[in-house]
């Protein structure tokens, strides 16, 4: 199996465009973290392992908040992120009138919660 492409840059405009063009079998997963963040480093391998188990129907975006401060700031203003790490997913089968409201999300570094989050995604994405 080839290595899954994980994107490391995203803007609000690109996200809005992606959300408009997702088909019912697709989803976008966004992970916010930072190299200096201990909890982010704690879940890094768990996230990478889970990313690799999905088909290309799941678009994975792993954002360092220092390199993607603009979109991180947009989420902070909308009170969708109050700290990192934060993972959120948007399913193509759902309408996304408000780009900043994900269909599901998880915060923190608890491995069980992170794995449960990925298991919920598996119910929607093959």
Predicted regions and their residues:
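Beta-strand cores of modular interaction/reader domains in eukaryotic scaffold and signaling proteins
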Residues: 28-31, 59-62, 86-90
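Thiol-based oxidoreductase modules, predominantly thioredoxin-like and allied folds used
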Residues: 7-12, 32, 43-51, 55-72
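Non-catalytic, surface beta->alpha helical segment in thiol-disulfide oxidoreductase systems
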Residues: 82-83, 88-126
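N-terminal leader/targeting and pre-domain segments
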Residues: 1-27, 111-126
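Eukaryotic short linear interaction motifs
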Residues: 38-39, 68-71, 96-97, 113-115
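Local sequence-structure signature of Cys/Sec-based thiol-disulfide redox active-site neighborhoods
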Residues: 16-52
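Mid-chain, well-packed structural core segment of small domains
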Residues: 70-83
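Structured beta-strand/turn binding interfaces of compact recognition modules in eukaryotic regulators
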Residues: 33, 63-66, 90-92, 109
């Amino acid at each position: 199996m080839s290595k899954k492409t994980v994107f490391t840059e995203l803007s609000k405009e690109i996200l809005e465009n992606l959300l408009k063009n997702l088909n019912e079998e697709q989803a976008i997963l966004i992970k916010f973290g930072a190299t200096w963040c201990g909890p982010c480093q704690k879940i890094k391998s768990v996230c990478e392992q889970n990313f690799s188990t999905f088909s290309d129907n799941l678009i994975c975006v792993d954002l360092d908040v220092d390199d993607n401060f603009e979109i991180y700031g947009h989420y902070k203003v909308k009170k969708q992120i109050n700290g990192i790490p934060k993972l959120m997913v948007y399913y193509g089968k759902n309408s996304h009138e408000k780009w900043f409201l994900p269909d599901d999300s998880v915060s923190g570094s608890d491995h069980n919660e992170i794995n449960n989050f990925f298991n919920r995604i598996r119910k929607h994405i093959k």
